[in-house]
A protein has these predicted regions:
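N-terminal accessory alpha/beta regions
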Residues: 56-197, 201, 207-225, 246-250, ...
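Bacterial N-terminal signal peptides
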Residues: 11-24
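Active-site substrate-binding loop specific to GH73 endo-beta-N-acetylglucosaminidase modules
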Residues: 146-149, 153-164, 169, 175-179, ...
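Flexible, low-complexity segments enriched for small/polar residues
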Residues: 29-39, 44-58, 84-96, 100-106, ...
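Surface-exposed interaction patches
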Residues: 193-194, 203, 217-218, 242-243, ...
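A mature extracytoplasmic/lumenal domain signature
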Residues: 51, 63-66, 75, 237-239, ...
C-alpha cells in the first residue's frame, strides 16, 4: 500500500466512523431508496442475527421456507452430516484429536519449554522490548515474517529445538482456522453462533499451561450441550479439564491435605496375577498429586496446599448468578470448599506431570469435609456430591435464569436488553428447568426480535465482521489462518482472551476510527486478492457481466442497503479509481452499514 493510499483510507475511515457510532439502530428511514421490502427486511435481519452474515443461498432458503419455519428448523437438532464442511476441515489434522493424543504428539517437554522462554526473554531484554503478555500469546500476535525469524533464531541457538519449536502453536492455529471455517461455511449456522456464545460465556485461555491441548475436547463438550439443559452444560464445564486448569481448581485442596493420603489410596489398587498394577475405577493414584511411576518411593514434593477461590467466584459471578445475583464473599468461600478435590487425572494438586490422561477426577483426601452453607442453603457433607448439589442450586436459581436470559437477549437483540423480553425469557428458563432451546425460541419468536425496533442495532465483533465479509462476498478460503491472523490484529485473537470474562458483546468495545480503518483495510485487501489463500472470482461483477456500480454491488453483498450519507461518501471514493469492481466490493464491505447486524 502506498503512502497516498494509506492516507486516503484514513480520511475515508474518519468520514465514516461517525455514522457507525451513532446511537441506536440504523433504522429503515436511513436506508437508500433501493431498500428491501418489509418481508425481505425481516429475512435479512433474522439472518444477520442467527448466522454469521447472510449469504445468497441463505436468503433463498429463508424466502422459500418463511422466517418462522426457518427459525424452527435452526432450533431442531441436526440430522445430517455437513460433508462439505468436513472436507474443508479435513486438512486440520489436530481437530480430530483428543487431549491425550495432542499432548503425546505436540507437547514440548518442560525443560525444552524453559529454554525457549529463557531465550526469548534474553532476546527481548537485549532488544529493549517490553515483556508484556505470555510468550505464546506474543508469538501468536506476530506477523508471519516475524514468526519465521523467531523460529530461525531459536533453532540457531538451540539446534535440538528444530523439530519441537512451535508445535503447540500448530494446535492453537488449527483451532482458530477451524473456528473460522465452521463460522463461514457450516450449513447449520445457529449451531456455530451458539458454540461461539457459550465458549465466550465459559471462557478459557488456551495459552495457560496445557489448556491448549484441552480446548478441542472442551469445545466439543460445549457444542454437544449448547441447546440442552443449562444445568447439564454447567456440570460438564465444571468437570472439564480445561476449566479446572484455567481457574486453578485442579490444585484446590483442604489446607491440611497431605499427598501421603493419596499414597495410602494407592494400596486400593489391585495387583493382578501378571504383576502389572491395574487401577480400580475412581481409585486415586500418586501421579495426580505430583508423584509417578518413577518417584513413588520419593518424599512427596514440598508445597503449600490450600483452598483456591478462583473457580467458585467466577462460577457465581460469570457463569450463573451474575455480579448482582445475591451472593456474598462468605458464599464464595463455602463454594470453594465444596469444590476442593475436583481435579484432573494426570495433573492434580501436586503439579502437572507427564501423565496426560486429562480427565476429571475427584480426590477425596484433598476435599474439605463438613457441611457448607451457600445462599442460605445447607449443603450436607458429601464429598463430590456437594459440588453437584451446588451446581444444581445455582442452575435453578432465579438470578441465573435472569442473567443467562439477559446475555442471550443481548447477543440476539440489543446491547441494552429490553426488560420485558428478558422477563419472558427468564420465565421460560425457570418453567422448563433451564431448557436453552426453549429460551431461544421465546427470544427468537418475540416482537422485540422480529420487529423493526432493534434492526441493525448490534455492531459486529472482529470475528463476526471477517466471517460475514467472506460469506457476503462469496470468497474461497484455502488458508483460513490468514483470516484468523486478521481477526487477531483487530483485537480479538480466538481462544486467547486471558480474563475469564470473555470478549465484550457491546458496540463501544469495537467502535473507533482505528478499528474502522483496520476493517476497511481488510475489506479492500480481501476484495483486491491481497490475502494469501483467500480469493474472490469476478469481484463486483454481476451475473450479466455488466459494468458494476456502487448500487449494484451493495444490492448483492449488503441487501439491507447503504444510508444516503454512506452512499455519498463511498461513491466519491469509488470514482477516484473509475469504479474499479474490486474496490467497490471492498468499500461496501468496509461501510458502516456492513459493520452492523
Amino acid at each position: 500500500m502506498t503512502r497516498r493510499e494509506s492516507r486516503s483510507r484514513a480520511i475515508l475511515s474518519i468520514a465514516l466512523v461517525s455514522q457507525l457510532a451513532l446511537p441506536g439502530p440504523l433504522g429503515a428511514t436511513t436506508l437508500a431508496p433501493s431498500q428491501p421490502p418489509d418481508d425481505d427486511a425481516t429475512t435479512i435481519h433474522v439472518l444477520n442475527r442467527l448466522t454469521f452474515g447472510p449469504s445468497s443461498a441463505d436468503l433463498e432458503k429463508v424466502r422459500r421456507l418463511g422466517v418462522s419455519e426457518w427459525i424452527d428448523a435452526q432450533l431442531r437438532p441436526g440430522t445430517s452430516a455437513d460433508t462439505a464442511l468436513a472436507t474443508r476441515l479435513a486438512p486440520l489434522v489436530t481437530l480430530s484429536m483428543g487431549a491425550v493424543e495432542l499432548r503425546e504428539k505436540y507437547e514440548i517437554p518442560p525443560n525444552i519449554r524453559q529454554q525457549i522462554q529463557k531465550a526469548r526473554a534474553e532476546r527481548d531484554a537485549s532488544a529493549g522490548k517490553e515483556g508484556a503478555g505470555a510468550p505464546g500469546e506474543r508469538y501468536e500476535q506476530m506477523d508471519p515474517k516475524a514468526r519465521r525469524e523467531e523460529r530461525e533464531a531459536m533453532v540457531r541457538r538451540f539446534p535440538q529445538l528444530a523439530t519441537l519449536l512451535g508445535t503447540p502453536q500448530k494446535v492453537v492455529a488449527e483451532l482458530q482456522a477451524g473456528k473460522v471455517l465452521r463460522a463461514a461455511f457450516a450449513e447449520r449456522q445457529l449451531d456455530e453462533v451458539m458454540a461461539d456464545f457459550w465458549f465466550n460465556h465459559f471462557n478459557v485461555f488456551a495459552r495457560k499451561g496445557p489448556v491448549e491441548f484441552m480446548v478441542g475436547d472442551y469445545e466439543r463438550t460445549l457444542r454437544e450441550r449448547s441447546f440442552g439443559k443449562f444445568e447439564d452444560l454447567l456440570v460438564a464445564v465444571a468437570q472439564s479439564p480445561a476449566m479446572l486448569f484455567y481457574l486453578d481448581n485442579w490444585q484446590s485442596t483442604d489446607p491440611n491435605f497431605s499427598p501421603r493420603d493419596l499414597y495410602r489410596a494407592q494400596a486400593r489398587t489391585r495387583m493382578p496375577a501378571n504383576g502389572s498394577p491395574r487401577r480400580r475405577p475412581n481409585a486415586m493414584v500418586p501421579e495426580m498429586m505430583g508423584g509417578g511411576a518413577n518417584n513413588q518411593a520419593k518424599q512427596p514434593p514440598k508445597r503449600t496446599f490450600g483452598i483456591n477461590e478462583n473457580y467458585a467466584r467466577e462460577l457465581m459471578e460469570l457463569h450463573t448468578l451474575g455480579v448482582d445475583g445475591g451472593y456474598v464473599q462468605a458464599d464464595v468461600v463455602e463454594v470453594a470448599k465444596a469444590f476442593t478435590g475436583w481435579t484432573i487425572l494426570g495433573e492434580g494438586p501436586g503439579g502437572p506431570r507427564r501423565n496426560k490422561e486429562s480427565r476429571f477426577a475427584f480426590a477425596a483426601p484433598a476435599h474439605v469435609k463438613g457441611d457448607k452453607r451457600v445462599l442460605g442453603v445447607t449443603i450436607k457433607d458429601g464429598g463430590e456430591k456437594e459440588g453437584l448439589e451446588i451446581l444444581h442450586l445455582l442452575a435453578t436459581h432465579p438470578s441465573t435464569a435472569r442473567f443467562i436470559s439477559s446475555k442471550l437477549v443481548r447477543r440476539f437483540v440489543a446491547d441494552h436488553p429490553p426488560e420485558g423480553l428478558v422477563d419472558r425469557a427468564a420465565a421460560t428458563f425457570a418453567k422448563t428447568g433451564g431448557d436453552i432451546r426453549e429460551v431461544l425460541r421465546t427470544i427468537l419468536k418475540s416482537e422485540e426480535f422480529l420487529g423493526p425496533a432493534y434492526r441493525a442495532a448490534k455492531v459486529k465483533t472482529p470475528f463476526e465482521f471477517v466471517v460475514s465479509a467472506v460469506r457476503a462476498s462469496g470468497a474461497e478460503v484455502r488458508n483460513p489462518q490468514v483470516l484468523a491472523q486478521k481477526i487477531s490484529a483487530m483485537g480479538m485473537p480466538l481462544y486467547l482472551q486471558q480474563p475469564p470474562t470473555g470478549y465484550k458483546d457491546a458496540a463501544e468495545e469495537w467502535i473507533s476510527t482505528t478499528s474502522l480503518l483496520e476493517r476497511m483495510n481488510f475489506a479492500l485487501d480481501l476484495s483486491a486478492g491481497r490475502l494469501r489463500g483467500v480469493s474472490l472470482k469476478g469481484a463486483g461483477r454481476s451475473a450479466d457481466n455488466k459494468a458494476p456500480t456502487l448500487d449494484t454491488v451493495a444490492a448483492r453483498i449488503l441487501p439491507a442497503g447503504l444510508s444516503p450519507k454512506s452512499r455519498e461518501t463511498l461513491e466519491a471514493e469509488a470514482q477516484k479509481d473509475g469504479n474499479d469492481p474490486a474496490k467497490l466490493v471492498g468499500l461496501v464491505l468496509g461501510s458502516p452499514e456492513f459493520q452492523r447486524r
